[in-house]
Design a protein with these regions (language model features):
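C-terminal accessory/tail domains of diverse enzymes
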Residues: 1-183
Length: 183
C-alpha cells in the first residue's frame, strides 16, 4: 500500500485533498489512492487494505467483523460528540513499523510520553470493548475467534514461519495456505 493516510480533520478536508490531487494530475480518481484505509465516496464505504493479506475465509470473516464493529463504535463516538484521543502522526507511523517488524509481539507507543503497551494486549482489550457492539451486530463469535487467535498465537504469519522452520521450503508455505483456504 501507499501507507497511512494523511491526518484530515473531517470529510470536507478529504474531499478538498482529493480535488487537489486530481487538479494537479496526481490521480484521475480515488481508485489510484492506495492508503491502508480510505473512504470510497462512490460506494459509501471504508476500504481496509489489510484484508488482502488474510489467508483463510474464516479469518477474513473474523477480520471483517472486527472492522464492522470498529466502524460502528467510531460512528457512535462521533454521534455522541465524543472526542477520541489522537496520537501524533509520527507515533502512529512508528507503531505501524513496530507491528510490521515485530508482529503481534510488538510493544506499541500509547501516548506522547513514550509509554508502551503490548500490541497483543491492546488488540485483546479493543476487541473486548467491542463485544457489546458485536452482540448487536450478531458477530460476537467472530470477535471471540480473533481473541483466541491472538491469545493462542495462531496468527497467519506465525504459521508461515513455523512451516518454513519445519520444512525449509517456501513451496510448503504455499501448500499450507492452499490447504487452509480449502477448509
Amino acid at each position: 500500500t501507499a501507507g497511512l493516510p494523511p491526518v484530515l480533520k473531517n470529510y470536507s478536508e478529504f474531499q478538498k485533498f482529493m480535488r487537489t490531487l486530481q487538479k494537479a494530475n496526481a490521480i484521475q480518481s480515488i481508485r489510484e489512492v492506495w492508503w491502508d484505509i480510505r473512504p470510497h465516496p462512490g460506494f459509501g464505504t471504508v476500504e481496509v487494505r489489510v484484508c488482502d493479506a488474510v489467508p483463510t475465509i474464516e479469518e477474513m470473516v473474523n477480520l471483517a467483523a472486527l472492522i464492522q464493529c470498529l466502524t460502528v463504535g467510531l460512528s457512535d463516538h462521533y454521534d455522541d460528540g465524543s472526542q477520541l484521543e489522537i496520537l501524533d502522526p509520527w507515533i502512529i507511523q512508528e507503531n505501524k513499523w513496530r507491528a510490521t517488524r515485530y508482529g503481534i509481539d510488538a510493544d506499541i507507543i500509547i501516548n506522547d510520553t513514550g509509554a508502551l503497551q503490548s500490541l497483543r494486549g491492546t488488540i485483546v482489550d479493543i476487541i473486548e470493548k467491542l463485544l457489546p457492539i458485536a452482540e448487536k451486530l450478531q458477530c460476537k463469535n467472530e470477535l471471540n475467534n480473533l481473541i483466541n487467535m491472538v491469545e493462542n498465537d495462531d496468527i497467519p504469519y506465525k504459521r508461515q514461519m513455523a512451516e518454513y522452520a519445519n520444512s525449509k521450503d517456501y513451496i510448503d508455505i504455499i501448500k499450507l495456505y492452499i490447504n487452509e483456504l480449502k477448509k
